[in-house]
Swiss-Prot record:
Protein name per Swiss-Prot or TrEMBL: Spermatogenesis-associated protein 17
SUPFAM superfamilies, per the entry: P-loop containing nucleoside triphosphate hydrolases
Any one GO cellular component localisation term in the record: cytoplasm
InterPro entries in UniProt: ASPM, IQ_motif_EF-hand-BS, P-loop_NTPase
C-alpha cells in the first residue's frame, strides 16, 4: 500500500511539472494576448462607463421618483387621516359649545320667565298693591282735607288775631294822639277845631278828646330823665336775643343789698357792652373778593349795557340795530326826557304867557275864625 501511494504521488508531481512546462512555453503568447485584450478593452471602457453611469442614474432616478411618489402618497394619506381627526375633534368642540350655548339660552329663558313671574307677583303683592295703594291714597286725601281745613281755621284765627291786634294798636295810637292833642278840646269860651257849627254832628275826635285824659308832661319828662340814666340806652345797641325783652314793670322800692356789691346797672353795662374789635379783626377775611364784587357792580352801574360793542360786533351783523326814539334824531339827540318833559312849540301858542301854577287853598285854614261854634257849644 505504501508503494502504491508513493507511485501516485510521483505521477502527480510529474503532471504538475508537465503543466508548468507548458505554461512556461506559452508565457510569451499569453503576455501578447493579455496586452491586446486590455488594449481593446480600454478603447470601450469610457463608453461603457458612461453607459453604465447613465443606466445607473436612470435606474436610481426611477427608484428615487418611485420612492418620492410612495412618500407623497403615504404623506397624503397621513395628512388626510390627521386632518380628518383634527376636523372631527374641532367639530366635536363646536357641537359641544353649541349644545352648551343652546342649554344656557334655554336655561336663561326659563330663568327670565321664572323671575318675571316671581317679580310680578312680588311687586303686585308688596310694592304696588293696587288695593293697598288705593286705600293709602284715600287716607292721604282724607288727611290732606283735614289738615287743609285745620290750616284754614288756623289762618282765619290768625287773621282775626292780627286784625284784633291792629285794631287795638290803632285804638292805642288814637288814644295817645287824643291825650297829646287834649289841648284842642273845646272850652266854654273857644270852640275846638273838631267842633264846627256847620256840622249836624260833632267830629268823633271831639268826643274822643273829651274822654281822654291829658298827658302829664312833667311826670313824663321826669320818668324820661330817670330812664336816660338806666341801662336802656346802652342796651338798645345790643341784639334782640342778647338781653331778654319784656314789658316794663313798676320799680320795686327795696333797699340795696349790704356788702361789697357793684351797682346792677354798671354790671349789666359791663356784661352787655358792644364788641370793639381791632382794625385787624374788624377787617373781613374776604375783603379782596368783596372789593372785586363792588368794583364789578360799579362798572355794571356805569355801563348802559353789558356788551359794550354789541351794535358794532360782527356777531350781530344780521340783526338790525334799532335806536331809541327819544334819544336819537336826524342830527342831535332829542332833549325830551333829559332837559324837559313837555313838548314846546311856540307856533301853537295862543299867547306868550306861560302856564300859571296855582295851588288850591286849605279849607281848614280858610275857615279860621269864621265857622266855629259859639261859646264852645257842640252843634
Amino acid at each position: 500500500m505504501e508503494t502504491n501511494s508513493n507511485n501516485f504521488g510521483e505521477l502527480q508531481e510529474l503532471k504538475d511539472m508537465a503543466t508548468l512546462a507548458k505554461l512556461l512555453a506559452r508565457a510569451p503568447f499569453l503576455e501578447s494576448q493579455y496586452y491586446f485584450r486590455n488594449r481593446a478593452v480600454d478603447s470601450f471602457r469610457k463608453f461603457e462607463n458612461d453607459a453604465a453611469v447613465m443606466i445607473q442614474s436612470w435606474f436610481r432616478g426611477c427608484q428615487v421618483r418611485a420612492y418620492m411618489r410612495h412618500l407623497n402618497r403615504v404623506v397624503t394619506i397621513i395628512q388626510k387621516w390627521w386632518r380628518s381627526y383634527l376636523g372631527r375633534k374641532f367639530y366635536q368642540l363646536v357641537v359641544e359649545a353649541a349644545y352648551y350655548t343652546m342649554k344656557m339660552n334655554l336655561y336663561n329663558e326659563m330663568a327670565v320667565r321664572i323671575q318675571r313671574r316671581w317679580r310680578g307677583f312680588r311687586i303686585r303683592k308688596y310694592c304696588f298693591n293696587y288695593y293697598y295703594l288705593k286705600e293709602y291714597l284715600r287716607a292721604v286725601s282724607e288727611t290732606n282735607d283735614a289738615i287743609r281745613e285745620a290750616l284754614e281755621e288756623f289762618a282765619e284765627m290768625k287773621e282775626r288775631e292780627e286784625r284784633k291786634v291792629l285794631l287795638e294798636r290803632e285804638e292805642k295810637q288814637k288814644d295817645y294822639q287824643a291825650r297829646k292833642m287834649h289841648y284842642l278840646l273845646s272850652t266854654k269860651q273857644i270852640s275846638g277845631i273838631y267842633n264846627s257849627p256847620f256840622r249836624e254832628h260833632p267830629d268823633p275826635w271831639e268826643l274822643r278828646l273829651q274822654k281822654a285824659k291829658p298827658l302829664g308832661h312833667q311826670k313824663y319828662t321826669a320818668e324820661k330823665g330817670k330812664t336816660s340814666q338806666s341801662p336802656s340806652n346802652w342796651l338798645a345797641c345790643t341784639s334782640v336775643h342778647s338781653f331778654p325783652q319784656s314789658e316794663s314793670l313798676p320799680p320795686i322800692s327795696r333797699k340795696r343789698c349790704q356788702g361789697p356789691f357793684r351797682d346792677i346797672n354798671e354790671v349789666l353795662e359791663q356784661r352787655y357792652k358792644p364788641l370793639e374789635p381791632t382794625l385787624r379783626v374788624a377787617e373781613p377775611i374776604n375783603h379782596l373778593r368783596l372789593a372785586r364784587e363792588a368794583f364789578k357792580q360799579e362798572e355794571r352801574m356805569r355801563n348802559v349795557q353789558d356788551k359794550m360793542f354789541l351794535p358794532f360786533s360782527s356777531y350781530h351783523k344780521k340783526e338790525k340795530y334799532i335806536p331809541m326814539i327819544h334819544s336819537s334824531s336826524a342830527y342831535n339827540s332829542d332833549s325830551y326826557g333829559q332837559k324837559h318833559f313837555r313838548s314846546q312849540d311856540s307856533k301853537k301858542w295862543i299867547s306868550d304867557k306861560d302856564f300859571q301854577t296855582v295851588l288850591p287853598s286849605f279849607q281848614l285854614f280858610s275857615k279860621y275864625g269864621k265857622l266855629y261854634s259859639k261859646a264852645g257849644e257842640i252843634v
